[in-house]
Amino acid sequence: MASAARPAPSPSDCKKCGSHVAPSLLACPGCGALAHAATLTTLAASAESAEQLGDLTAALSHWRDALDLLPQNMPQYAVIHERIAGVSERVSNGEGKSAAATPEADGVRQVWKNGGVSAIVIAFLLKFKTILILLLTKGKLLLLGFAKLPTLFSMVAYGGYYWSRWGWPLALGLLLSLYVHEMGHVIVLRRYGVKAGAPIFIPGLGAFVMLKQVLNNRRENARTGLAGPLYGLGATVLAYVAYRVTGRTTFAAIASLSGVLNAVNLLPIWTLDGGRGFVTLTRRERWIAAAGVAIIAFLFHAPIILMLAGVCAAVAILGTPSDRPDPQMLALYLFLLAAHAGIAILAHSAVATAGV
């Protein structure tokens, strides 16, 4: 008597042991074989090739995609995680094709490496000079969010909320300033090969960017966090320049609001950008930040900024510091706070003088 024919294995069956592998599983429950072995091989080859070509952003993107297809208990997961950390470190140091190729940007990187007080001052000037260049060279990415319906709908709701209170010119200016700020996060996330959605705006509160992949380490988190206020500074500067050129106090009001919102976002607490920027600072650097903020408050005659200095001091005492110094983030943090607060104060004075 002939035996019944064995059914052909389905596409979801393990090729090694024949066990059924549910679509949500990353490894066979029977023998532990990787469910996406072929895809992982392709991603690894693409990542290696991208690294050799100097395209570190593409390499990180491929490695992160591979990490998503691996169970965390597999040894390959730890290996790729370390590989991502190494490539990410190179990106943080300004390596790779996506790094700005302007002489100004090269000067900033060289000054950071040399260190010193005078070097930091020069770096501030060079970086301030390149803010508008950043906005222009990243224009394509900045416009990316407008192609996403959820972003557009939330922008309309956000703009309408403030339009009803302050009128459309101020509402539109504030909306665009916040948009540039949030897209700064997205641009740097993509530089690190991290998939992220376009910004979603919440009327009366602000906006946020949904991550589709996790950041690998503190340095990525800090640089992504301060990217918002850095790009936001470009919007703040543009609004203030528009006021100086046209004399229209609406632009001064936009610059003032943009500066204040970005400065508040630099509070080193919770998930605010300042809190993310602080994660790579040692305890000593956090105390330097607190002292620097106090000096800014004194120079600008702004007692309210002393509150921020107090928060920095509290974080220096109570927070968990990094064991690795990060003078770049310390200097950038103080620069952004001074720039946003300074422009906000100047713009507010213009609005107050005009009696608006």
Predicted regions and their residues:
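Hydrophobic transmembrane alpha-helices and their immediate loop junctions
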Residues: 40, 85-356
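Cys/His-coordinated zinc-binding microdomains
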Residues: 18, 32-35
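TPR/TPR-like alpha-solenoid helical repeat scaffolds
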Residues: 36, 73-94
